[in-house]
Amino acid sequence: MKPVLSSAPAGRVAAWVRSAPGTHIWLLVIGITSLVIAGATEGLGDFLLHRTSSNIHELNRHPLSSLLISGFWIENPPSFVLYAALFELVHAHVERWLGTWRWLLTIGVAHVTATLASQELVLLAIEGHRLPRSMTHVVDIGVSYGLAAAAGLLAYRLPPPWRYLYLASVIGFFGIPLLSGATFTDIGHAIALTLGLAAWPLTPDAGADAAADGDRSATPGHPPPDH
């Protein structure tokens, strides 16, 4: 006889994971790399963090691999629990709503664009003698750019007036640091958030609005436009 009560929670968890496969595969990889960093010696840990960074040095040597690999590591392994919660609250909901490929496209573009733009600002600051040349080797890894983009997209999932309260909170969270000595990471977060907000056309609601506009234009009194 199969247990009913014990299998129900497991089934719900499995269904939740399957409904957002990209989020949970990504989270699994981050969990593994966090364990590697936590178990490594200090020297090996520093080497791995710098080698997998998308800083100026690594972008010049390994542009494609550094952009990809940097999104699978976090600098502080104990923060994995916080990131896991954020992945479930933000990424999983957005992936389930958009579909895996549109979600992946959005966060991928945001991660790459924010990384390249922020590192370009670092390079300009180094050339202008506002930052030391050692910043070419700065540790630049993490998942926060993707989270910022997904957080922007999540706004369109909420109905008014909650959407506007959420937007004000998110914009304040990522925008306030820009007013008080912003770092290159703060600027990257703002860029990623902006790209997430700009991805409205990828949402199901945008497609529904376009279909509704097409239906209205085809009704009597609203002939379709000439081409």
Segments from the language model and where they lie:
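Actinobacteria-biased recognition of intrinsically disordered, low-complexity terminal regions
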Residues: 1-23, 202-227
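N-terminal signal-anchor transmembrane alpha helix
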Residues: 3-50
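Aromatic-anchored segments of alpha-helical transmembrane domains
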Residues: 31-36, 111-120, 169-184
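N-terminal TM1-TM2 helical hairpin plus the immediately adjacent luminal interfacial "cap"
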Residues: 38-100
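Hydrophobic, membrane-inserted alpha-helices
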Residues: 66, 84-92, 147-153, 168-178
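Hydrophobic alpha-helical transmembrane segments of integral membrane proteins
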Residues: 100-130, 192-197
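Membrane-interface micro-motifs in multi-pass membrane enzymes
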Residues: 133-154, 188
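Loop-to-transmembrane alpha-helix initiation sites
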Residues: 181-196
